[in-house]
Amino acid sequence: MKMDERKQQILLAIIKDYINTAEPVGSRTISRKYKLGVSPATIRNEMSDLEEMGYIEQPHTSAGRIPSNLGYRYYVDCLMQREQLSEEEEVTIRRGYENKVREVGEVLNRTGRMMAQLTHYTALVQMPSFRRSAYKHVQMVLMGPSQAILIVVMDTGAVHHQMMTVPESITQQDLDQISSVLNAKLQGRTMDNIRLTLIKEIYFELSKHRSILDLALELMQDRVISVAEDKIYLEGVFNILNQPEFHNVERVKILLSLLEQEDTLKDILDFTRDRQGITIKIGNENLRQEIQDCSMVTATYQVGDKILGTIGVLGPTRMDYARVVTVIDCMSRNLSRTLDRILKGQV
């Protein structure tokens, strides 16, 4: 059986109506509201074909039909047109990022709040994983007697700096030697792939500067992971519970239990981390059984070409995909630009 234009129109009408009303859709409703130019009897026949093809299904207690996960997937891949944000909504987003915020955590918090507000679902925002960023350049500069500044540049463009106390006998030539060895050994390496043997090599080559090296390596690690690692910001938890699909107490308990498990949420978001653009998981496409009654739309955010983390929206499979995709795409682009400004302006 072939998915022709008329079947597409009827499937689109069923999905739009069900997203808006959460009520099963009958042939008369489609005929009355969507003006497809065919009789209710013809619509019924086409709906019967769509059901046989697996795109719609009949709830036990209703004469109407609702989209299946396969139907939603066909809609997202073939029929969906992104929704335009209103001018007021675009201004809200722009102002949310234009306000002078220098803390990464506050920017991510705002991102979550705006996503939850604009979609009316639950928003998840993953803290950047700086452990996965690589060292690009290390420089130590003598600032005065017993004072030096340590500057660390990461491949994301993030710049970290820290004052440190050094022996009075230390010269800029000594600091240049330390910087040169650190760059030779650490450049292009992330914190997670720096092995003990490499640290031993560094100490061997800089044995007469051991005390400075102890402090420098400690500060380098502290500055890079000073932001809470792998934290997940959740906003709008109760938004999803307001959906009629989640009026069942047991269903609510299962979902709330999942949302309390930060490690599990991190794993869910990490699954799409290496994919640029927007990822949509519908119903049982989600690997976790607890959210197989839900859909998840995610997008990565980045600085330059380095992916730092993931943002996502969790809602029922009856999600307004056209709106959510528009919102999350807009937010990921704005978040990337804002983090680029913050991270590169930390000197």
UniProtKB/Swiss-Prot annotation:
Pfam families: HrcA (PF01628). SUPFAM superfamilies: GAF domain-like, Winged helix' DNA-binding domain. The keyword Cell inner membrane does not apply. GO terms for biological process: negative regulation of DNA-templated transcription. The keyword Repressor applies. PANTHER family: HEAT-INDUCIBLE TRANSCRIPTION REPRESSOR HRCA. HAMAP family: HrcA (MF_00081). This is Heat-inducible transcription repressor HrcA. The gene is hrcA.
